[in-house]
Amino acid sequence: MAKKSIIARNEKRKRLVEKYAAKREELIKAGDYEALRKLPRDSAATRVRSRCTLTGRGRSVYAKFGLCRHMFRKFALEGKLPGVKKASW
């Protein structure tokens, strides 16, 4: 499980992205890169990391389910993910 501080930092970044999204869009359209540069660094969408909703793991996260590969496999084998079954050919 990821440290709580790392998860909290990522949540803060999500809030900042949401807060400055409209302003950032306006500045990009206007081409005002000086004002854009003065916005908080963490308000850029590229700084937000996709994380597993259960464990907080930041790598190998399936966006469609919001789960890391470990939890995805666990729930898929238990039949808790609708429409997901183990491949066999």
Swiss-Prot record:
Pfam families: Ribosomal_S14 (PF00253). Keywords: Ribonucleoprotein, Ribosomal protein, RNA-binding, rRNA-binding. InterPro entries: Ribosomal_uS14 (IPR001209), Ribosomal_uS14_bac/plastid (IPR023036), Ribosomal_uS14_CS (IPR018271), Ribosomal_uS14_sf (IPR043140). GO terms for biological process: translation. PANTHER family: 30S RIBOSOMAL PROTEIN S14, SMALL RIBOSOMAL SUBUNIT PROTEIN US14M. It comes from Chlorobium phaeobacteroides (strain DSM 266 / SMG 266 / 2430). It comes from the Bacteria. The keyword Hydrolase does not apply. GO terms for molecular function: rRNA binding; structural constituent of ribosome. Belongs to the universal ribosomal protein uS14 family. This is Small ribosomal subunit protein uS14. Coiled coil: none annotated.
